[in-house]
Amino acid sequence: MSSGYSSLEEDAEDFFFTARTSFFRRAPQGKPRSGQQDVEKEKETHSYLSKEEIKEKVHKYNLAVTDKLKMTLNSNGIYTGFIKVQMELCKPPQTSPNSGKLSPSSNGCMNTLHISSTNTVGEVIEALLKKFLVTESPAKFALYKRCHREDQVYACKLSDREHPLYLRLVAGPRTDTLSFVLREHEIGEWEAFSLPELQNFLRILDKEEDEQLQNLKRRYTAYRQKLEEALREVWKPD
């Protein structure tokens, strides 16, 4: 491991955009949130690629790279590469005493990890905590993907079984298109998002409110017209 990034090695060889609007709910206190629940909330919208498709995408990815952090495709179809994870922790995590490591608590701190396509979200979280000798359970943290479209920012929590390097490959190397964020898993949903994300949620809610209001007006306008027609039939002279 160099001072610039961490590396995640795997022994085994066999091993994409929605706005999250369910940010009002909190996780039940004292009960861990299962991976299956996460999968149900955040459905994976991608299907895995064939070896030829992966080869083509890796080639295009490397052509677009500007920071020399390229991907490498192995003969067995597994590829390795780099992801950058931004630390957005509300409080400093517990670390080993006299660890000599920098604290990961600095808001906005960026870390680069060298991983393979087989590494899951859960393994990436463990690698980040191990890098800083954090003694807290990985279950207390969650990895989010943050996507940017025009002037809007979307974020959703990834399930522990998803593969970050695959998401990076599909999205391309630009972090202004897709980025990864580590946050506390148990924090309230309101506090877990940045100001631009919350502002985007407000825009979505305002739009939904306006649509519901227009639907309600159309419904009662149609009801009024039918009622007036019925009254005219009743009072029509014989």
Swiss-Prot record:
Signal peptide span per the entry? none
Localization in the cell: Cytoplasm; Cytoplasm, Cytoskeleton
Please tell me whether the keyword Acetylation is annotated for this protein.
yes
The Ras-associating domain, residue ranges: 79-186
- Which cellular component appears as one GO term in the record? cytosol
Compositional bias (Basic and acidic residues):
38-48
Q: Which UniProt keywords apply?
A: Acetylation, Cytoplasm, Cytoskeleton, Microtubule
What GO biological process term is on the record, naming one? Answer: signal transduction
Q: Name one GO molecular function term.
A: identical protein binding
PROSITE patterns attached to this UniProt entry = RA, SARAH
Q: What is its main location?
A: cytoplasm
Protein origin, superkingdom: Eukaryota
Q: Which PANTHER family match?
A: RAS ASSOCIATION DOMAIN-CONTAINING PROTEIN 3 (PTHR22738:SF8), RASSF (PTHR22738)
Q: What is this protein called?
A: Ras association domain-containing protein 3
What gene codes for this chain?
Answer: RASSF3
